[in-house]
Amino acid sequence: MSNVPAELKYSKEHEWLRKEADGTYTVGITEHAQELLGDMVFVDLPEVGATVSAGDDCAVAESVKAASDIYAPVSGEIVAVNDVLSDSPELVNSEPYAGGWIFKIKASDESELESLLDATAYEALLEDE
């Protein structure tokens, strides 16, 4: 079973979301998602300043197996991207919940967080796959 940290929120598309002290949210893909994709070779990051809606594809993770869209779990403005991934996309594999984060977003409607899954619900989703 994949590692599913209890303090994070999750989307059904296998993104995770963590609230930061400054009120922004850090987004990445889950350990389960990176295991399915395999070794990352490139991450196409969103533009800082871009406004996205929940469910919009805003980044792409390319692995040796496939390219997979990464979706915004909530609506808002992209306020930072993990530029380190340009040279080290393998961090998505080795540190999916730490150094392998993809982008940070300032949520425009925090009520959208209610539609995300907690760790228990995400684990149940994985068991059904």
Curated annotation (Swiss-Prot):
Family: Belongs to the GcvH family.
Protein name: Glycine cleavage system H protein
Domain Lipoyl-binding: 24-106
UniProt keywords, alphabetically: Lipoyl
Gene name of the record: gcvH
One GO cellular component term: cytosol
Annotated organism of origin: Shigella dysenteriae serotype 1 (strain Sd197)
Purpose: The glycine cleavage system catalyzes the degradation of glycine. The H protein shuttles the methylamine group of glycine from the P protein to the T protein.
Subunit structure: The glycine cleavage system is composed of four proteins: P, T, L and H.
A Pfam family this chain is assigned to: GCV_H
Record-linked InterPro entries: 2-oxoA_DH_lipoyl-BS (IPR003016), Biotin_lipoyl (IPR000089), GCV_H (IPR002930), GCV_H/Fam206 (IPR033753), GCV_H_sub (IPR017453), Single_hybrid_motif (IPR011053)
PROSITE patterns: BIOTINYL_LIPOYL (PS50968), LIPOYL (PS00189)
PANTHER family linked to this entry: GLYCINE CLEAVAGE SYSTEM H PROTEIN (PTHR11715), GLYCINE CLEAVAGE SYSTEM H PROTEIN-RELATED (PTHR11715:SF3)
Superkingdom classification of source: Bacteria
Lineage: Bacteria, Pseudomonadati, Pseudomonadota, Gammaproteobacteria, Enterobacterales
Cofactors that this protein relies on: (R)-lipoate
